[in-house]
């Protein structure tokens, strides 16, 4: 994922002098959103909080990282918010309007004359879990066989793949496509050996929804966009990266929305909670099994070992 830039944004009041009552506000909490256009569906994510009597919102667009909303308010039976200035100068400002319908958050994104409908549902009620605990595993599943791309598909089938296997190592010779495992997983442990080129930027998506950043940043302080960060959401406790060109090992366990990561023998995440999807997620159906996805549309990565052990 592109290097994370944390931007502080001033919150606009929900309504001057009119505090929002939590007990009468059905918008509060988290929402897993699916937007639908004529050509595709794509995931979004929203969290609405009440702080000091005013609404505060956090939004995950289809790419990038979760950000605080600059504008959010309740207007009668509707929730209205904007993600801020348009992506390019002169473009119309994006505005979201939503209402509650049979327990769902039903909304639209409007940019000038373009309107995109979307529907949000509540995320799963995650059971108490400890990704760092001892687990009982099923048989190992070798996702990379060292020979070819059996068991993998392209995220964008109509675009060049760019992935090849040479001397038992999987690599993306040309940036441009992500690869997705054909198998889906619920709770699991994953073991991967990989290396990066200088300044390389890639990512590993768990269940296709939660990105662990893969970045050449050895020697730098841990960051929201640093190596093995839950991209834009959780900073690693330590940067355990090796320099570019050296083989690295990652041992990752995902149980519910809890993740533990050991990078090069050092624990960098210890049963941390993932609040929601990250940018680039395949969907927002957090309760469903999902694939492993390796990002190949940014920079070069080499992978020589990739094994998943499902948790019973």
Q: What name fits each language-model region?
A:
Residues 5-15:
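Bacterial N-terminal signal peptides
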Residues 17-22:
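Sec/Tat signal peptide C-region and signal peptidase I cleavage site
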Residues 25-312:
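Carbohydrate-interacting regions of secretory-pathway proteins
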């Amino acid at each position: 994922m592109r290097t994370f830039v944390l931007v502080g944004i001033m919150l606009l009041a929900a309504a001057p002098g009119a505090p929002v009552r939590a007990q009468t506000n059905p918008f509060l909490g988290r929402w897993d959103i699916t937007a639908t256009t004529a050509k595709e569906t794509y995931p979004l994510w929203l969290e609405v909080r009440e702080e000091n009597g005013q609404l505060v919102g956090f939004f995950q667009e289809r790419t990038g990282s979760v950000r605080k909303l600059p504008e959010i308010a309740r207007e009668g039976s509707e929730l209205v918010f904007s993600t801020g200035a348009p992506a390019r100068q002169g473009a119309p400002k994006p505005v979201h309007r939503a209402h509650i319908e049979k327990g769902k958050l039903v909304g639209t994104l409007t940019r000038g004359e373009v309107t995109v409908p979307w529907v949000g549902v509540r995320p799963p009620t995650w059971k108490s879990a400890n990704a760092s605990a001892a687990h009982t595993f099923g048989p190992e599943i070798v996702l990379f066989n060292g020979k070819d791309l059996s068991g993998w598909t392209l995220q964008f089938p109509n675009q060049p793949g760019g992935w090849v296997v040479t001397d038992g190592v999987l690599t993306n010779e040309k940036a441009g496509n992500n690869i997705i495992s054909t198998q889906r997983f619920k709770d699991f442990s994953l073991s991967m050996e990989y290396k990066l080129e200088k300044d390389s930027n890639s990512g590993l998506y768990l269940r296709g929804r939660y990105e662990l950043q893969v970045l050449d940043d050895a020697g730098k302080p841990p960051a929201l966009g640093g190596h093995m960060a839950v991209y834009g959401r959780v900073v690693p406790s330590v940067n355990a990266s090796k320099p570019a060109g050296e083989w690295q090992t990652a041992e990752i366990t995902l149980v519910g929305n809890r993740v533990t990561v050991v990078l090069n023998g050092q624990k960098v995440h210890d049963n941390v909670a993932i609040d929601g999807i990250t940018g680039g997620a395949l969907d927002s159906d957090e309760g469903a099994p999902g694939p492993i996805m390796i990002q190949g549309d940014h920079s070069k990565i080499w992978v020589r070992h990739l094994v998943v052990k499902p948790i019973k």
